[in-house]
């Protein structure tokens, strides 16, 4: 829980700044190059790129810097600084903050562009950087630009959030003649803004992409833009399995989800997004994966993607920083345009803080608009219908701040923890190139007591690799970075059996609590690491990495079975990342265990509907975009028959 702290005085600020600069130069120091290696690469420091000046330490990082300052960290020689950082990363109260700072520093060091749009380290990593320039202009959705410090708007329906769920509901209701206002916390991005730079990604993600569950147990990624996560996701379009749909019908009361009626919602979504496999081109990182699967006789399939027919795989690889081609059929290019044509309005840069309720019914929302120039305004939207579609983290937070939704708000959070195992191969993979995700295997889908994981390859870029590698010392980290071009990264995405929760801190902001405590989930985590390592070994990897701290690694010539046993026995908390936050305001028949009824309307407040992945009763067991959109369309149809008086 975040605590209120007194702002540091000038002397404390100066000491923190000096300590932070030395932390950065300890993480990325000047070291002697190995024989035959590029001298400038090994000599360059974080200070040479001004990394410390870019950082804005939060309270936890400030406490870490104060503790290091009390130890005289800034005046110690490099070996002592290195040993202290390594020790504190492994144990003690500051370990989560230090690991987070380490990832932030290393990620920035290998991604920060200069005035020419390039990073000085890229050439020595074999990384080409951007492969094309953005278009000079691109089509934009018209957005409201209200003036003054008090803004009042009215609508039939206020949709909070514009991602996979909110966009569908906005388009459907606007198409049926409702006055719809979409309120989005993020800004609008277009292909003209997408420079194919990792450094730009912070503005497209919730909390800049630097976000973890309490205690650093799992990293969290969620979109924050007009179009939500669909703007920056990897375009994986998978239908929910039949067994999931059957369970939602039988155990949670969503009877129609197991019928042909829901098939129609799925088909409509796929058609609007132009979901297809014809434009899927197997990416370099997928090649050793499918080779190993073939050798083991395990099935895999091409991933269906929401792309235009003119999608060019040669220009792909940067989807997580936006699609410069405009080929990705994200909701800002599909459903939000449909909504706009039907008269919907859009207000961006607005953080909704509370839902207005009177007499047990919705009356609108209040929030804060922050303009590009930094000026702010208090926004009040009067609307008898409110759709909460702010994502699996912010949707329950808004309900909690509003004091509505019942006892299940924030509970039952599923995160689809992804466990990464990477192989270093004797040839160049160049995993940053090609379409981000092109192949999936369901071979381990039910690996443990009805739970399991999907096997998928992912993209790899300097920032991501630098931030995830286990740091032992500055010289070793630089040596590992030099292997970047030969790395094939894969992950096992678990459909979690246990759950976490979303609560509020003292300032009313969302805090995610999650532990890898469920026995089934712990078994799946071990299986994911073991099976991915086996596949890398079969595919001919010379080294196999995980993201454990301290590291777990296998090198050619070592006993692989011993490595496999170590993976099986390891503690896997603190290792995974989550790009899918689900179920935290779920639908169901029982108000004690669900937030909304089986159609999506809150049990306790008329006119407030859940319209995003938070509404899912449990994990959908696959990448959730298509399921989210189909459920949203289903909810929109239910809303169309609803008559809520103003």
Regions found by a protein language model. Give the residues of each.
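Rossmann-like flavin
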Residues: 78-98, 226, 230-313, 492, ...
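N-terminal FAD cofactor-binding segment of flavoenzymes
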Residues: 178, 185-243, 285-294
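FAD cofactor-binding and catalytic pocket of flavoenzymes
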Residues: 2-3, 7-10, 233, 251, ...
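Flexible, low-complexity segments enriched for small/polar residues
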Residues: 5-110
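Glycine-rich loop(s) and the adjacent beta-strand/alpha-helix scaffold that form part
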Residues: 172-181, 186-198, 219, 225, ...
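C-terminal lid/capping helical subdomain adjacent to the catalytic/cofactor pocket in oxidative enzymes
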Residues: 53-54, 123-151, 176, 403-404, ...
